[in-house]
């Protein structure tokens, strides 16, 4: 059942149901970059938006899983080139686990939350989406 949910989330993301809200520049999938370093770099530059993806849970007592789609502009150092990218994370607030969606298979790839950079990234995303940090210091 989890595999069906993963594939349906990936299908929604690929179908364009969650689009980058920029009317002057259409999404170009040739510019897509699913690197886990893409969203943090764009976030550092200040060009990003966090969208919460609705998820379904079969077990009402299971800890909530949050799926965040991060749409971002990545600007080159000279300020002339802009690329559009999207990175999708799945976060378990209770267990502090995180995953990155890879669209080639599609599947969720686990990401460590033990490093300072990953804690900063997930805290910033969770603050933007919910107003609270993902991992308290």
Predicted regions, residues:
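Bacterial N-terminal signal peptides
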Residues: 11-19
């Amino acid at each position: 059942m989890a595999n069906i949910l993963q594939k349906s989330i990936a299908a929604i993301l690929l179908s364009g149901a969650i689009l980058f809200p920029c009317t002057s520049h259409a999404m170009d999938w040739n510019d897509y970059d699913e690197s886990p370093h893409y969203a943090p770099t764009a976030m550092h530059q200040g060009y990003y938006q966090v969208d919460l993806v609705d998820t379904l849970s079969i077990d009402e007592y299971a800890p909530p899983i949050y799926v965040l789609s991060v749409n971002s502009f990545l600007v080159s150092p000279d300020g002339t080139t802009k690329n559009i990218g999207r990175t999708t994370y799945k976060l378990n607030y209770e267990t502090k686990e995180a995953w990155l969606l890879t669209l080639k298979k599609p599947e969720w790839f686990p990401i460590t939350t033990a490093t300072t950079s990953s804690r900063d990234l997930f805290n910033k995303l969770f603050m933007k989406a919910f107003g609270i940090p993902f991992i308290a210091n």
